[in-house]
Swiss-Prot record:
Gene Ontology CC annotations of this record: cytosol
Binding-site residues for D-ribulose 5-phosphate, renumbered to this chain: R37, E38, D42, R150, P151, G152, H153, T154, E174
Cofactor(s) it depends on: Mg(2+); Mn(2+)
Name of protein: 3,4-dihydroxy-2-butanone 4-phosphate synthase
Cofactor: binding details: Binds 2 divalent metal cations per subunit. Magnesium or manganese.
A GO term for molecular function: 3,4-dihydroxy-2-butanone-4-phosphate synthase activity
Keywords: Lyase, Magnesium, Manganese, Metal-binding, Riboflavin biosynthesis
Residues where Mg(2+) 1 binds: E38
Site feature location: Essential for catalytic activity: H136, E174
Length: 213
């Protein structure tokens, strides 16, 4: 991680605190990982406050693969099986089967329909029969222990939601450049400044958790 580029947003502690303030106000944040890992930045929003305009931003400015990060407990409660039995992807990203709300959507692919699906899934009383499969929202199962166990965007998202006082469920999508390539740290920072978003790294969350928990 090129730490020097992030110092304009403060030190690790300050960056996490700014991100938590944004999230508490229902705004998004940009979470980056190490350049020796995926070297990507994910745009993240709290699941329980996601809006249609925010979903439009995720679809237009990011990869379009909108993911719902959930705890293992929530995944089991919703009856979501893993997408594959043998996960052979490089970072073992834990995709479950995709979901759609059973009611309140049309084809499920519009921004409004995806918001409906997410808000349905994160309700405390949501049951497996309230969802259908496959769908246009892709749940991810976070590992217990968060970023201290796996330094991934999924765990970082769930950790941030907990720290911000939300239920541990968040939305993420990978930021892309206008030409379709993946945004790297310089482009991520420019996007953050343009849209007044906080930027932090997974390493920042690791340091914050070690200090505060």
């Amino acid at each position: 991680m090129n730490e020097s580029l992030l110092t304009q947003f403060g030190n690790s502690l300050t960056r996490v605190e700014k991100a938590l303030e944004n999230l508490k106000n229902g705004k998004g944040v940009l979470l980056v990982d190490d350049e020796n890992r995926e070297n990507e930045g994910d745009l993240i929003f709290p699941a329980e406050t996601i809006t249609v305009p925010q979903m439009v931003m995720l679809i237009r400015e990011c990869s379009g693969i909108v993911c719902l990060c959930l705890t293992d407990k929530k995944v089991k409660k919703l009856g979501l099986t893993q997408m594959v039995h043998n996960n052979t992807c490089t970072y073992e990203t834990a995709f479950t089967i995709s979901i759609e709300a059973k009611e309140g959507v049309t084809t499920g692919v519009s921004a409004a329909d995806r918001v409906t699906t997410i808000l349905t899934a994160v309700k405390d009383d949501c049951k497996p029969e309230d969802l259908c499969h496959p769908g246009h929202v892709f749940p991810l199962r976070a590992r217990a222990g968060g970023v201290l166990t796996r330094p991934g965007h999924t765990e970082g998202t769930v950790d941030l939601m907990r720290l911000a006082g939300y239920n541990p469920a968040g939305i993420l999508c990978e930021l892309t450049n206008p030409d379709g390539t993946m945004a790297r740290l310089p482009q991520i920072i420019n996007f953050a400044k343009k849209h007044n978003l906080a930027v932090l790294s997974i390493e920042d969350i690791i340091k914050y958790k070690k200090i505060t928990t």
